[in-house]
Amino acid sequence: MATARRFPPQVVRALDATKVLRIRAGSAPHRFIGIWVVVAGGRVFVRSWELAATGWYHTLRREAAGEIQVGTRTLAISARAVRSESVLRRVDEAYAAKYSTPGSVKYVRGLRRGRRRASTTELLPA
């Protein structure tokens, strides 16, 4: 089985340092939106808060493609669902560590439960 492509280390560092990732899911032209992003084990993960049927998460799940903005660069991405409990736990920990301000804690708790946790998606270079 081939291993998944990974983002270059400088991209991973930039994503780890940013609080809000700009993402455009799918192939249809539309605006970029801001979401939280974490890095765990050198891999890049996102979760959906809203889970709207027409939102970025469901579009990304249907098409498994999109773009992210990292600094001044726009990068094509692919996406895959995460089901491994050990990976989900590492992503839980990454969210808790990165978004630890008093105003963020309640959202982190929500992202660590139920459907939001099940929305964990790994972003990969296309």
Give the label of every model feature segment.
Residues 41, 125-126:
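A short, structured loop/turn motif at beta-sheet edges
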Residues 30, 51-125:
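Short, structured beta-strand-loop surface elements
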Residues 1-22:
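Extreme N-terminal tail/first-helix region
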Residues 18-51, 57-58, 66:
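Short beta-strand segments
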